[in-house]
């Protein structure tokens, strides 16, 4: 109450001070107006006199210009502006004495001051003059232009304020605003409503666990994270001057540059990145699957995290998990909300980001009709109106599923070589635009072609060349004027990457620049001669076959030298993502190296011709050595 009374007292004192200032200002304004009125009255006769003198001088000058010299006694200075007749000094003397002679004359002014008339008094008579004929010369004179710069004739009289008044106003204005603010605060305090009722702990828990609150919180927390984590560089120079000034940088995009890292302290720690995939519908989204965390037995074994490249937040967009390690994962093509995972137990799980649950919305049964071994390959193939989920497990079983029903597979097939040996599949790839034929890599190091339908359904050709298990396989993806869809690359534990064609069962070329297991390989989606591979020493290599086939075109080693398990190109081909054995995902910008020129396809065709010629020469030399 004391604070409120002090506030009111302070307000009253300010109001009194404000009233005093206003009265003082009003009094000064009245005095100023009174002074101006007095000065105006004093200036008026002087102004009239000065105008009359000016007109008189103009008249004299006009008379002199035409040869008339006014007599000195006829140019007396008028005493007042209202006077119509002015007496000469001699006349004044005669008038004082009372003698009114016949020669008395007066200078009389017309209503128009510019016209001068000499008249004699009618009562006193007129002196007789001798008249004669004279020549009259008529001359016209333009009136003199009079320009007045007086404030009185152009703008209203300016009001001059004293410095004291200005200081008073400067002092009053903020006080007025402060007083009004205090009044508003006082009114708000008086009209303040009663505080809302405090909720009980039971009511709070009921709200926190309600489905509506969970959905709202799950949706809005992502928006807030995006806003808080955004740190765009407002000083970025698009002209490239900063890149030119840096020492050691040849050109922007000549080398791999680190963009960002995805890592969650809770869900990524002590887990291995097993698979990654980019979304076709939302290119900024990437999903990654993780193995189990042996240090956290109570946590779910399988985890899939959806990361967002568009926003600079450090947490995943979505967190999904299941009870078995997720060995493979992909976005369901034509279904942007669905994520498919293949688990170590053999189950196929399906997550939906429209559901606020983190567990799968669908899963396949653990039965002989489906998979019972680890599933390392999941892929959605087909078109918008006719597509299927294709999965392959390490026991050689391939299943085709409908995403609407995962209870039973639509069709299944045993991938068996020579009708007796099941193929332990570790990788699968479909050529671009093909949904029937595919290639698979196996644990024995052999590569096979296979077919889903037709008379030759099952395992077809055999490609031998690797000396260890095949860890990665990928078909050529870049679409251009020349079709290279028959090409594919494989990586293996034998420290090599091999280039193959489905038209020949021997490798076209073997890239042997690595000194550790090569865990994955992938073609660029836009450049015909570019592919990326990763190895167990934490090294990412980019090979541009149009530039060199002996050493990588660009290479980078990640911090800590953790083994890199997976590599995936973004859809635009400008970024490449790699996952390591510590649960971290590294994003690198490829830059201009990934942009193909118009002649890249023809150059790559010539490169393939040279590779085939060199392989033929080496085979001939080998045959000669064997014969010798």
Swiss-Prot record:
It is found in: Cytoplasm; Chromosome, Centromere, Kinetochore; Cytoplasm, Cytoskeleton, Spindle pole. Keywords: Acetylation, Centromere, Chromosome, Cytoplasm, Cytoskeleton, Dynein, Kinetochore, Microtubule, Motor protein, Phosphoprotein, Repeat, Transport, WD repeat. Homodimer. The cytoplasmic dynein 1 complex consists of two catalytic heavy chains (HCs) and a number of non-catalytic subunits presented by intermediate chains (ICs), light intermediate chains (LICs) and light chains (LCs); the composition seems to vary in respect to the IC, LIC and LC composition. The heavy chain homodimer serves as a scaffold for the probable homodimeric assembly of the respective non-catalytic subunits. The ICs and LICs bind directly to the HC dimer and the LCs assemble on the IC dimer. Interacts with DYNC1H1. Interacts with DYNLT1 and DYNLT3. Interacts with DCTN1. Residues 1-114, 152-204 are annotated as: Disordered. WD repeats lie at residues 268-317, 321-361, 370-411, 420-460, 465-510, 513-553, 559-598. Residues 1-13, 20-60, 172-204 have a biased composition (Basic and acidic residues). The modification Phosphoserine is found at residues 50, 83, 90, 94, 97, 162, 180, 618. Pfam families: Dynein_IC2, WD40. Residues 80-90 have a biased composition (Low complexity). Its main location: cytoplasm. Acts as one of several non-catalytic accessory components of the cytoplasmic dynein 1 complex that are thought to be involved in linking dynein to cargos and to adapter proteins that regulate dynein function. Cytoplasmic dynein 1 acts as a motor for the intracellular retrograde motility of vesicles and organelles along microtubules. The intermediate chains mediate the binding of dynein to dynactin via its 150 kDa component (p150-glued) DCTN1. May play a role in mediating the interaction of cytoplasmic dynein with membranous organelles and kinetochores. This is Cytoplasmic dynein 1 intermediate chain 1. One of its GO terms (cellular component) is cytoplasmic dynein complex. Residues 70-79 have a biased composition (Pro residues). It comes from Mus musculus (Mouse). SMART domains: WD40.
């Amino acid at each position: 109450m004391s604070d409120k009374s002090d506030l009111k007292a302070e307000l009253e004192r300010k109001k009194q001070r404000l009233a005093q200032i206003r009265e003082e200002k009003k009094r000064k304004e009245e005095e100023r107006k009174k002074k101006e009125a007095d000065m105006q009255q004093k200036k008026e006769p002087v102004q009239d006199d000065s105008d009359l003198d000016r007109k008189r001088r103009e008249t004299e000058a006009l008379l002199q210009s035409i040869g008339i010299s006014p007599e000195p006694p006829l140019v007396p200075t008028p005493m007042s502006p209202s006077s119509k007749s002015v007496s000469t000094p001699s006349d004044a003397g005669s008038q004082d004495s009372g003698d009114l002679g016949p020669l008395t004359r007066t200078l009389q002014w017309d209503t128009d001051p510019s016209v001068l008339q000499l008249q004699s008094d009618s009562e006193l008579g007129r002196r007789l003059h001798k008249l004669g004929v004279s020549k009259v010369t008529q001359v016209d004179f333009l009136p003199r232009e009079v320009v007045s710069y007086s404030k009185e004739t152009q703008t209203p009289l300016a009001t001059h304020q004293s410095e004291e008044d200005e200081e008073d106003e400067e002092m009053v204005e903020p006080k007025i605003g402060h007083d009004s603010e205090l009044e508003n605060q006082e009114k708000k305090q008086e009209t303040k409503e009663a505080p809302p009722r405090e909720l009980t702990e039971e009511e709070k828990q009921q709200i926190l666990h309600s489905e509506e609150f969970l959905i709202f919180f799950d949706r809005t927390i992502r928006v807030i994270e995006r806003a808080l984590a955004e740190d765009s560089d407002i000083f970025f120079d698009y002209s490239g001057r900063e890149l030119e000034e840096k020492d050691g940088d040849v050109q922007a995009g000549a080398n791999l540059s680190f963009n960002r890292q995805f890592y969650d302290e809770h869900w990524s720690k002590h887990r291995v990145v097993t698979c990654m995939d980019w979304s076709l519908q939302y290119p900024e989204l990437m999903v990654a699957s993780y193995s189990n965390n042996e240090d956290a037995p109570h946590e779910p074994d399988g985890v899939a995290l959806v990361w967002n490249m568009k926003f600079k937040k450090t947490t995943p967009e979505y967190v999904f998990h299941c009870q078995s390690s997720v060995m493979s994962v992909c976005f369901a093509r034509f279904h942007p909300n669905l994520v498919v995972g293949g688990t170590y137990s053999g189950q196929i799980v399906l997550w939906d980001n429209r559901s606020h649950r983190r567990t799968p919305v669908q899963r396949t049964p653990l039965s002989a009709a489906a998979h019972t071994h680890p599933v390392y390959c999941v892929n959605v193939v087909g078109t918008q109106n006719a597509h299927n989920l294709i999965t392959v497990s390490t026991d050689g079983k391939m299943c085709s599923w409908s995403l609407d029903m995962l209870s039973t597979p639509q069709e299944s097939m045993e991938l068996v070589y020579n009708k007796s040996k099941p193929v332990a599949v570790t990788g699968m790839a479909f050529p671009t635009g093909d949904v029937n034929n595919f290639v698979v890599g196996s644990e024995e190091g052999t590569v096979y072609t296979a077919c889903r339908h037709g008379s030759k359904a099952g395992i077809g050709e055999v490609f031998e060349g690797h000396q260890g298990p095949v860890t990665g396989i990928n078909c050529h993806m870049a679409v251009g004027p020349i079709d290279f869809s028959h090409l594919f690359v494989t990586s293996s534990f034998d420290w090599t990457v091999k280039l193959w064609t489905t038209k020949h069962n021997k490798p076209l070329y073997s890239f042997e620049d690595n000194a550790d297991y090569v865990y994955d390989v992938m073609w660029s989606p836009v450049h015909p001669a570019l592919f990326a591979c990763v190895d167990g020493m934490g090294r990412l290599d980019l090979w541009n076959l149009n530039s060199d086939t002996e050493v990588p075109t660009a290479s980078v080693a990640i911090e800590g030298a953790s083994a890199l398990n997976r590599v995936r190109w973004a859809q635009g081909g400008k970024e490449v993502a790699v996952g390591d054995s510590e649960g971290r995902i590294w994003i690198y910008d490829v830059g201009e190296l990934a942009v193909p020129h118009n002649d890249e396809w023809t150059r790559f065709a010539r490169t393939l011709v040279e590779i085939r010629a060199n392989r033929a020469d080496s085979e001939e030399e080998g045959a000669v050595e064997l014969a010798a």
